[in-house]
Amino acid sequence: MYAILFELDTNCLNDNYEGNTYHNSYKLVNDFMIENGFTWKQGSVYFGGANIDAVTCVLVVQKLSKKYPWFSTCVKDVRMLRIEENNDLLPAIS
């Protein structure tokens, strides 16, 4: 399983996002990622489905930055992770 995670510079978004408030940018990214086979997990972390591979992750991020130029301008960090196991630790602290 692969994941994409990123951090956006909110000051940069405030200056470069075309909408009323930069908070809407996160909704646009969320919708885009879901449309491209990812599931939102938390914050700016998206897990890919069974058909998502490393090449697809790169292509999706490129497509995202082409569709929303403010993304590539304002992203401080964007990573692809390969996840061997997805274990929920919540039961360990409940």
From Swiss-Prot:
Question: Which Enzyme Commission number(s) are on file for it?
Answer: 3.1.-.-
Record-annotated disulphide pairs: none
Q: Where are the transmembrane segments?
A: none
What the entry lists under InterPro entries is as follows:
VapD
Asked if Hydrolase is a keyword of the record, the answer is yes
* A GO molecular-function annotation: RNA binding
Q: Which domain of life is it from?
A: Bacteria
Q: What keywords are assigned to this protein?
A: Hydrolase, Nuclease, Plasmid, Virulence
Could you tell me what this protein does? Cleaves ssRNA, mostly between U:A.
Family to which this protein belongs: Belongs to the VapD ribonuclease family.
How this chain assembles, per its entry, is:
Homodimer.
- According to UniProt, the name of this protein is Endoribonuclease VapD 2
**Annotated organism of origin:** Riemerella anatipestifer (Moraxella anatipestifer)
